[in-house]
């Protein structure tokens, strides 16, 4: 009798209330959710497809297996690693049913154009994208994705040499865009493009970077809607005299800059290179922080709460 009761009780796992299953599955990572749970039974698949589980697809702990190469795209990704990413993306997108609003990738997870396009087409309602590695993504790939993401509000991206093509697409297609984080040096060209294309941006983070002083001055003058600016652990760069090679690192903000930042709701800065570890790392790495050398997860940090992972 006891064995019969136990057998009946175990069989009822498939009848467990969907709401309870969803609460349990909320504790699981995307890797666990795509590991076969949906194939246990129809009830479990229904729970696995609940939109609340897929509001954020977080792949910030998944890295590509790659080697650096001297020519573009400067990385070669192992086939098995690429296949693993494709599998995760396909399963996630199938289960999410287009409900994903936030998509997060590791800074050493190198998507191809095909992977990016596939993902963009299956989650057109994205509002936030964290995509720090663009080595294998071409202009056509990212522009196609931006055209799909009409509701995009926030983007974390690497510093790029030719920003107009991207920021122009954002301006044309993403009317609610308000938040940008740049990982890497911030040049005058980028600042000018930002002012031209996205003058109404509200939040900008360029932490742990080398920032041209002229570029900083331009955004303070040219972004009238800017409310939050984060330059924590960054240093300013100037060039003295007539020789561009004579680079000067500025470790203190002068009166002119402080006066211009006074209008902001929040101005976040730290330039204490003597005692601050992150300031020291930025300077040692010459404004392009080698995140792989440091504690896992450091790259996710941001003093702006809406950008922190």
UniProtKB/Swiss-Prot annotation:
Q: Where is the signal peptide?
A: none
PANTHER family xrefs: F-BOX DOMAIN CONTAINING PROTEIN, EXPRESSED (PTHR38926:SF13)
Q: Which GO terms describe its biological process?
A: defense response to Gram-negative bacterium
Keywords in alphabetical order, please. Leucine-rich repeat, Repeat
One GO MF term attached to the UniProt entry = SCF ubiquitin ligase complex binding
InterPro entries in the record, alphabetically?
Answer: F-box-like_dom_sf, F-box_dom, LRR_dom_sf
* Domain F-box intervals: 10-57
Residue ranges annotated as transmembrane are none
What are the LRR repeat spans here? Answer: 77-107, 108-133, 159-184, 208-233
Is Coiled coil a UniProt keyword of this protein?
no
Please report a single Pfam family linked to this protein. F-box-like
Q: Which domain of life is it from?
A: Eukaryota
User: This chain belongs to which protein, by name?
Assistant: F-box/LRR-repeat protein At3g48880
């Amino acid at each position: 009798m006891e064995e019969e009761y136990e057998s009946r009780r175990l069989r009822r796992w498939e009848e467990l209330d969907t709401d309870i299953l969803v609460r349990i599955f909320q504790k699981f990572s995307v890797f666990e959710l795509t590991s076969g749970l949906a194939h246990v039974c129809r009830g479990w698949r229904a729970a696995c497809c609940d939109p609340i589980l897929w509001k954020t697809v977080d792949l910030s702990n998944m890295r590509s297996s790659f080697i650096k190469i001297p020519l573009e795209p400067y990385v070669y990704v192992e086939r098995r690693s690429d296949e693993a990413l494709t599998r995760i993306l396909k399963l996630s997108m199938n289960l999410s049913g287009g409900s994903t609003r936030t998509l997060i990738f590791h800074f050493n997870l190198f998507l191809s154009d095909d992977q990016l396009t596939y993902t963009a087409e299956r989650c057109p309602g994205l509002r936030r994208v964290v995509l720090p590695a663009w080595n294998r993504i071409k202009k056509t790939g990212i522009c196609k994705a931006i055209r799909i993401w009409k509701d995009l509000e926030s983007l974390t991206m690497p510093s790029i040499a030719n920003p107009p093509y991207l920021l122009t697409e954002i301006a044309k297609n993403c009317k609610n865009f308000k938040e940008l984080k740049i990982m890497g040096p911030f040049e005058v060209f980028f600042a000018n493009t930002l002012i031209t294309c996205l003058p109404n941006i509200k939040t900008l983070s360029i932490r742990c970077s080398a920032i041209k002083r002229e570029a900083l001055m331009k955004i303070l003058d040219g972004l009238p809607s800017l409310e939050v600016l984060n330059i924590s652990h960054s240093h300013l760069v100037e060039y003295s005299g007539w020789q561009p090679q004579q680079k000067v690192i500025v470790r203190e903000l002068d009166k002119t800059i402080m006066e211009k930042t006074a209008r902001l709701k929040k101005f976040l800065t730290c330039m204490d290179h003597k005692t601050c570890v992150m300031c020291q790392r930025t300077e040692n790495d010459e404004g392009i922080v080698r995140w792989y050398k440091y504690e896992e997860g450091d790259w996710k940090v941001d003093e702006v709460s809406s950008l922190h992972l």
